[in-house]
C-alpha cells in the first residue's frame, strides 16, 4: 500500500499574484495548499551608463556598443559579471568588442547563448559556478533557474523584454541571503 501523496511545489522570485499561482498549481489536486513567503528585503543597486555626448540616437547602429569601454571598469571591480544582451548576434559582437578593447580578458570572459555548442555552454556554466570567469556575455539563456554565487554584477544592455525579465536578470547577482543585487 502506497501511503505517499504527491506534493506540488511552486517556487518563484517574481510571481506577482501568489494566490492565483497557488490556485493554478493546486487545482488538479483539489486541495487548498499553503503559501510560504520569505519576509526578507532585497537590496538592489541600479546604475545607468550613458554616452559622454548624447546624440540624436546615442545607440543607433549597434546597441550600446560605444559604451563598451565604460563596461570594462565595472567588470574589473566585480568578482564575476553577467552582461545580458537581447540578441545572439549582438552578444557575439559585444564579446568580440570587449576582447578587442582589452585582449588581456581572453580566457577570463566567455559567451553564452542558445546557439553555442552544448559542451561549451556547460563549460561556461561550470566556470561561472566556480568563479573562474570574470565576465560572461549572454542572452536569455542565463535568465532563469540558475544560481551562480560568484556573480556580483549584472549589466543589461538596452531594455529587457519586460519588467519580470529585468527582475530575473538583476536577481542573478548577489544571489544569496543578505547580498546586494547590482
Go through each PLM region and give its residues.
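Helicase motor core with emphasis on the C-terminal RecA-like subdomain
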Residues: 1-182
